[in-house]
Amino acid sequence: MAATDVRPKITLACEECKHRNYITNKNRRNDPDRLAMKKFCPNCGTHRVHKETR
């Protein structure tokens, strides 16, 4: 049942240091592709692009 969930939980990882810093929900109908957001990375200490991980 969770595999067909409309709003699954996803993990966002920093592109630079690869740390998984954020967990959020995503609407599959609006965003079928991989999500990329600019968020603050506490490990790098700056704002970096975080991409959706599998």
Swiss-Prot record:
GO terms for biological process: translation. Transmembrane segments: none annotated. InterPro entries: Ribosomal_bL33 (IPR001705), Ribosomal_bL33_CS (IPR018264), Ribosomal_bL33_sf (IPR038584), Ribosomal_zn-bd (IPR011332). GO terms for molecular function: structural constituent of ribosome. Keywords: Ribonucleoprotein, Ribosomal protein. Pfam families: Ribosomal_L33. GO terms for cellular component: cytoplasm; ribonucleoprotein complex; ribosome. Belongs to the bacterial ribosomal protein bL33 family. This is Large ribosomal subunit protein bL33B. The gene is rpmG2.
